Curated annotation (Swiss-Prot):
E.C. no: 2.7.1.59
Family: Belongs to the ROK (NagC/XylR) family. NagK subfamily.
Catalysed reactions, semicolon-separated: N-acetyl-D-glucosamine + ATP = N-acetyl-D-glucosamine 6-phosphate + ADP + H(+)
InterPro entries linked to this entry: ATPase_NBD, N-acetyl-D-glucosamine_kinase, ROK, ROK_cs
GO molecular function: ATP binding; N-acetylglucosamine kinase activity; zinc ion binding
Binding positions for Zn(2+) per the UniProt entry: 157, 177, 179, 184
Biological source species: Aliivibrio fischeri (strain ATCC 700601 / ES114)
Gene (name only): nagK
Protein name (record): N-acetyl-D-glucosamine kinase
Pfam families: ROK
Length: 303
């Protein structure tokens, strides 16, 4: 039995999956935002409850909006303040008497897609989230790859490439990132970036959904903006694809519902790739909001 926990800023979602990777139990509880001991107790209590229900000790995986320090194991997270700087994996292991896997929630999203029936035989899957922020996860042979310092999936904190700057023009905004650097692609490729760039070029604040609607209606500014953004996506994605050469790319987050992306990227990518580079299959993520808990559970599949 595989147990997955999607630990968010307001709620913890639990899911239990059997050996066929079918979800057989679900539960949601509020996240303890201030009391760390209660946070650990809440997770441990759910584990004990479902161990008793299923008569086995489930394998436990946690997905978090952050990462473990690769040297100390301390948790780096801002969305779950009670756990910031704490040793959640080690403390939970001591509490329940078994090993626990923990990973970034974007890696869990990618892992969930990689273990979909349609993709599970793909040697590599890249998950990219076009949501409030831009992030991603890398899956090789069914396992999440976190790298030496646990930052391998932090694709949003790579910098905007030089040809993207040329594309955006000499008055392109140099945006500061929450990580402390400037020019991180998180601020440009996310849904938030989609809106910020529109406001920068046209002096008008609009929600992404309204820009997309205006584009469909033929509004000149929206049409120009979407064309610029699609080319920006192609330039930045081509950089990532040249580095990692994934077989399949699954897109999630609110902006991934913009169907034009799946028409435009295959046409725009080739000129930005190496001459021998191939455009990977680009699909919309299938598991939506349940992806985090699925992926967390599946951290234990290939021990």
């Amino acid at each position: 039995m595989y147990y997955g926990f999607d630990v968010g800023g307001t709620k913890i979602e639990f899911g239990a999956f059997n050996e066929k990777l079918e979800r057989v139990a679900t539960e949601r509880i509020p996240t303890q935002t201030e009391n760390y001991s209660l946070l650990v107790d809440d997770i441990a209590s759910l584990i004990a409850k479902y161990d008793a229900e299923f008569g086995v000790e489930g394998k436990v995986g946690l997905g978090i909006p952050g990462m473990e320090d690769a040297e100390t194991g301390a948790l780096l997270t801002s969305n779950v303040p009670a756990a910031k700087g704490q040793f959640l994996r080690k403390d939970l292991e001591a509490k329940i008497g078994r090993s626990v896997k923990i990973d970034n929630d974007a890696n869990c999203f990618a892992l969930s897609e990689a273990w979909d029936e349609e993709l599970k035989d793909s040697p590599s899957v890249m998950g990219l989230i076009l949501g409030t922020g831009f992030g991603g996860g890398l899956i090789f042979d069914g396992k999440a790859f976190s790298g030496y310092s646990h930052v391998a999936g932090e694709l949003g904190h790579s910098r905007l490439p030089i040809d993207a700057w040329f594309h955006l023009g000499e008055n392109a905004p140099l945006l500061e990132c929450g990580c402390g650097n400037k020019g991180c692609i998180d601020n440009y490729l996310s849904g938030r970036g989609f809106e910020l760039l529109y406001a920068h070029y046209y002096g008008e604040q609009k929600k992404a959904i309204d820009i997309i609607k205006a584009h469909a209606e033929g509004d000149a500014n929206a049409v120009e903006h979407v064309d610029r953004f699609m080319e920006l996506l192609a330039i930045c994605f081509a950089n990532l694809f040249t580095c990692f050469d994934p077989h399949v790319v699954a897109l999630g987050g609110g902006l991934s519902n913009f169907e034009l992306i799946y028409e435009e990227l295959p046409k725009r990518l080739p000129k930005h790739l190496l001459s021998v580079g191939r455009v990977p299959r680009i699909i919309k993520a299938k598991h939506g909001d349940s992806g985090g808990v699925r992926g967390a559970a599946f951290l234990n599949i290939k021990d």
